[in-house]
Amino acid sequence: MEVQPRQIDNYIKSDGSSPFEEWLSSLRDTNAKTRIRLRLKRVAMGNLGDYRSLGQGVFELRIDSGPGYRIYFGQIASLFVILLCGGDKSSQQKDISKAIEYWRDYYERLKNSN
């Protein structure tokens, strides 16, 4: 299987905010931030690493650092990754619900723009 580079974009809410960027900038652990950014660089090169499907078009990247950080994303075809939000193991269920809500909103706006 050939590795395909992916374009990574952030989900932007209708109010202009980016839940993923807000979460990442709120992290105080600079080591974790660095590991997350490095992981996203590997994703952009086509290496998703440790991830799983959560259903309804949403996926979870697992980061082996700190309290078990998670990045939630959606994919369009196999080339575009949309970062929805992030969290850790303690807020996982709430974060998954938000990610599904954000993905539905993103997808609806995408369909309506065409």
Q: What residues fall within each predicted segment?
A:
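Basic, Lys/Arg-enriched alpha-helical interface segments
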Residues: 1-67, 77-81, 88-114
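Short, surface-exposed beta-strand/loop micro-motifs that present aromatic residues
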Residues: 70-74
